[in-house]
């Protein structure tokens, strides 16, 4: 059965799982998230840097509203939340809905693992047993073993130092979108900064911001590309499905994004104790990091929820980067909670993508004007 509705009671009544992925302001606001920082020579990206923080301040009330609907109409349901920017959303959930049945997730590392499995010769990523830690879009793989316990991390490091996260014979023709090929190649530069573990490719925005700005068209950003390609294809097909009332003959294919969230629902429903990468309160899993930080680490998932795996101490370089980033995210949630201009200014000033407080203030003032319909009034 397929039902399309904007009535919360219809949508949320008698459900076991809410698979949530909202975009407050839609792609029109994403375009501004990207273009406003670029005007000042700063990275313009969906979830990283100033754009991600603007998106976060818009997303918080929408995500909280969805949780309230679920708790009203299906109080025993789980919400599996893909809504971005996941770290800021997760911090808001921790702070304002600490007892809610919400699990925040991201498929970006899973997508990289799909390629990593091919690089290392596995049939698929589920043949690998990984160790990973960090924040959302801000982490590192420290171990990749097969089911017999053989370690492959040094093989992956050697490969990434030479090819990035591309196959040895990769070229842009193997990718539906050439920008993802460029992103995979850039891992070669990221891992060279610390070749002891394998980084998430999103570090390109934090560690090589000038390169990203130089190779971005400030008048036609990633949001515009998505509007002109994926949005037309996917939303057009969804509109057709809604009209005919069935997805039987759809041209859309299930990918890693869908597979991962269904695997999580399956683990919760059937107590499979599957090992999955989730965004959860640290609570000492990373022993030398803030206990209340929302970290992305492997967890064992069953009918009662999740159990995080212990990470232990992390090195100074990774810890320093994470402390800077997590406090940017906390300041954004402070700004939402307190309706504080100062807290949002501090968040932008602290962010690694922003060069100084003067630029942070200019970006913030432009964001306030652009987000009048979405942000709380900042005083």
Question: Language-model features: where?
Answer:
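Rossmann-fold NAD(P)-binding glycine/threonine-rich loop
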Residues: 24-97
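Long, compositionally biased stretches enriched for glycine and/or charged residues
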Residues: 121-379
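An anion/phosphate-binding loop that grips the pyrophosphate of nucleotide cofactors and donors
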Residues: 15
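Internal, well-ordered domain-core segments that constitute the primary functional module
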Residues: 66-147
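Soluble or luminal CAZymes and related metallo-dependent hydrolases
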Residues: 55-62, 108, 256, 324
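Short acidic low-complexity segments
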Residues: 2-12
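Residues lining the SAM
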Residues: 21
């Amino acid at each position: 059965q397929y039902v399309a509705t904007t009535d919360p009671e219809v949508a949320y009544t008698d459900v076991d799982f809410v698979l949530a992925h909202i975009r407050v302001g839609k792609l029109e606001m994403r375009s501004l998230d990207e273009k406003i920082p670029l005007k000042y020579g700063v990275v313009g990206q969906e979830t990283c840097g100033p754009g991600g923080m603007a998106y976060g301040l818009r997303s918080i009330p929408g995500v909280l509203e969805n949780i309230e609907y679920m708790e009203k109409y299906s109080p025993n349901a789980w919400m599996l939340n893909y809504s971005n920017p996941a770290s800021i959303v997760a911090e808001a959930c921790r702070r304002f809905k600490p007892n809610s049945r919400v699990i925040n997730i991201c498929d970006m590392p899973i997508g990289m693992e799909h390629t990593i499995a091919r690089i290392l010769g596995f049939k698929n990523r589920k043949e690998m047993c990984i160790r990973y830690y960090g924040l959302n879009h801000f982490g590192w793989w420290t171990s990749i073993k097969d089911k017999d316990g053989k370690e492959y991390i040094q093989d992956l490091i050697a490969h990434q130092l030479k090819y990035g996260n591309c196959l040895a014979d990769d070229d842009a023709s193997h990718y539906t979108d050439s920008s993802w090929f460029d992103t995979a190649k850039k891992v070669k530069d990221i891992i060279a900064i610390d070749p002891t573990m394998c980084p998430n490719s999103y570090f390109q925005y934090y560690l090589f911001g000038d390169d990203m700005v130089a190779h971005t068209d400030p008048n036609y950003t990633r949001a515009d590309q998505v509007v002109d390609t994926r949005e037309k294809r996917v939303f057009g097909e969804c509109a057709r499905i809604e009209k005919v009332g069935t997805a039987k003959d759809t041209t859309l294919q299930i990918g890693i994004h869908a597979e991962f969230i269904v695997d999580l629902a399956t683990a919760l429903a059937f107590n499979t104790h599957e090992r999955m990468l989730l965004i959860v309160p640290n609570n000492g899993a990373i022993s030398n990091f803030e206990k209340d930080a929302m970290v992305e680490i492997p967890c064992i998932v069953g009918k009662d929820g999740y159990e995080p795996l212990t990470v232990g101490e992390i090195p100074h370089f990774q810890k320093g980067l994470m402390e800077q980033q997590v406090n940017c995210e906390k300041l954004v949630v402070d700004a939402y909670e307190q309706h504080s201009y100062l807290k949002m200014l501090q968040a932008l000033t602290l962010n690694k993508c922003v060069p100084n407080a003067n630029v942070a203030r200019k970006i913030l003032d432009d964001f306030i004007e652009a987000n009048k319909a979405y942000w709380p009034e900042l005083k």
